[in-house]
């Protein structure tokens, strides 16, 4: 089965940008860099800022890499799919959410719903908190303490239906 381009995960550890998932590039086996990825890989500013602020001068003590999920409003449709976290977990990499302010309740919902997510970095976390979370993650501990409001199941289902194009009238009926 051919995967959609949006499900492909590439490494951001070096300029080669090797494919990590679903089909790993051969050169990944010989790479000495830790595997880090941002998914979906469409926000160049997030990618550059994340690499420079949180990944440089860090050492991952774990044998598997990390997928940092761009949990922002432009990607909302992806996160109403019940299988997105399971699909990324098939890569064997740790999943960490990078949540913007508007999707914090949905990110908190997924932290509670999925045991595949190792942590969450909020947009308003200060530098010290971000560094502490990265240290916890890179030493094999969780950084999944949630903060703020959380969607409940009913709110999630309503959001999913709105995103799929169902009107309020259709939902009520």
Range-by-range predicted roles:
Residues 1-141:
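N-terminal regulatory/sensing modules of transcriptional regulators
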Residues 144-173:
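Helix-turn-helix DNA-binding segment
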């Amino acid at each position: 089965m051919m995967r959609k381009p949006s499900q492909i995960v590439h490494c951001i550890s070096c300029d080669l940008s090797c494919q990590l998932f679903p089909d790993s590039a051969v050169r990944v086996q010989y790479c000495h860099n830790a595997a880090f990825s941002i998914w979906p890989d469409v926000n160049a500013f997030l990618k550059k800022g994340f690499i420079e602020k949180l990944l440089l001068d860090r050492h991952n003590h774990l044998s598997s890499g990390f997928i940092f999920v761009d949990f922002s409003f432009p990607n909302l449709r992806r996160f109403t799919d019940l299988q997105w976290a399971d699909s990324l977990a098939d890569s064997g990499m740790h999943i960490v959410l990078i949540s913007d302010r508007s999707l914090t309740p949905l990110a908190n919902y997924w932290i509670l719903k999925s045991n595949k997510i190792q942590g969450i970095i909020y947009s308003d976390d200060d530098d010290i908190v971000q560094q502490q979370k990265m240290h916890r993650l890179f030493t094999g501990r969780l950084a999944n303490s949630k903060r703020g409001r959380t969607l409940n199941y009913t709110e999630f289902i309503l959001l999913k239906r709105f995103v799929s194009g169902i009107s309020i009238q259709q939902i009520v009926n």
